[in-house]
């Protein structure tokens, strides 16, 4: 296996050689709250990365990846962030569904879907959240029923799943071809029991996708309605009724080594905010200076924690990481608004536009991917061994 520093140098040089021409215009585009930016152009960039063998780095070689270590992947994400390269468009496929299929999927599912994730020809979205469930992921009301003739031919015959229900806050659904959906497949089941993890094609009459207008004026999220939508009987990952275990497995992949690359981007945002404070005169305010110093200290603490735990698997470490970066980024957004002063009250304001968008989207940082309250409950109950929260 290539040495980490040699691989880091390879990535740095490749990015310098390739993030040029039309691709240079994509620098800094995409990411949370900005997924709509130059989407098709970023897809082309993502395919360019794939052709160079710079996607799916941690996947096993037999599944098309490079089988690289956590340290190699950290090096990639750090160099990628330092180059200000555009956010990838196939996050859900490369970092969530792909590893899930490798861990829980059948050989047939792996053969069918992994190559198209690798070459970025099929995009995926995540069908977890529901409108009446809040942060309670187990409160699933979307249903799926297996119908058809099981005896017609083969193990599942002519059977297929019929899906009804609604998912919400579904990022990238209006660009994706497929959605991995958690649905209730056992009538009368409650909570974690009776759930299944289904792979559902979105281009069919039984699926309606409605973009949600955000505070920023963009539409990155969607509502997805399933009205007798169908998917093949064999497109359940794991066993029917075992969907909770598979879904939790997917979530363990969600908060991975990309966090260190994310922190490089945060460091750039912090540096840019310091420069803005100097230009506007806000840096003359001792309270602003103190908050900027505290923010920088928090960023270093996050990085130290991520480096110390990247090779360690223990309960709660991902939850602590999520709490750290979500709170840090929300506070940075608040500092940015104060640095702008009265100019921060209007959205279309040239130089300040990016900071207002950062502030608006950072309000969601402590909610999506598991709210702060959920993270604290998990840490308290599963790590510290405290009594479970009393339900009202």
Curated annotation (Swiss-Prot):
Catalytic activity annotation: 3-[(3aS,4S,5R,7aS)-5-hydroxy-7a-methyl-1-oxo-octahydro-1H-inden-4-yl]propanoyl-CoA + A = (2E)-3-[(3aS,4S,5R,7aS)-5-hydroxy-7a-methyl-1-oxo-octahydro-1H-inden-4-yl]prop-2-enoyl-CoA + AH2
GO molecular function: flavin adenine dinucleotide binding; oxidoreductase activity, acting on the CH-CH group of donors
Organism: Mycolicibacterium smegmatis (strain ATCC 700084 / mc(2)155) (Mycobacterium smegmatis)
Protein purpose: Involved in cholesterol degradation. Catalyzes the dehydrogenation of 5OH-HIP-CoA to 5OH-HIPE-CoA.
Record note on quaternary structure: Heterotetramer composed of 2 IpdE1 subunits and 2 IpdE2 subunits.
Family: Belongs to the acyl-CoA dehydrogenase family.
Entry GO terms, CC: plasma membrane
Active-site residues per Swiss-Prot or TrEMBL entry: 254
One of the GO biological process terms: cholesterol catabolic process
Domain of life: Bacteria
InterPro entries referenced in this protein's UniProt entry, alphabetically: Acyl-CoA_Oxase/DH_mid-dom (IPR006091), Acyl-CoA_Oxase/DH_mid-dom_sf (IPR046373), AcylCo_DH-like_C (IPR036250), AcylCo_DH/oxidase_C (IPR009075), AcylCoA_DH/ox_N (IPR013786), AcylCoA_DH/ox_N_sf (IPR037069), AcylCoA_DH/oxidase_NM_dom_sf (IPR009100), Mycobact_Acyl-CoA_DH (IPR052161)
Cross-referenced Pfam families: Acyl-CoA_dh_1, Acyl-CoA_dh_M, Acyl-CoA_dh_N
Keywords: Cholesterol metabolism, FAD, Flavoprotein, Lipid metabolism, Oxidoreductase, Steroid metabolism, Sterol metabolism
Phenotypic effect of disruption: Deletion mutant grows normally on glycerol but shows impaired growth on cholesterol. It accumulates 5OH-HIP in the culture supernatant.
Cofactor: FAD
Binding sites annotated in the UniProt record for FAD: 126-129, 171, 371-373
Entry-linked PANTHER family: ACYL-COA DEHYDROGENASE, ACYL-COA DEHYDROGENASE FADE29
Keyword match Oxidoreductase: yes
Annotated cofactor note: Binds 2 FAD per heterotetramer.
Keyword set includes Lipid metabolism: yes
Documented EC number(s): 1.3.99.-
The protein, known as: Acyl-CoA dehydrogenase IpdE1
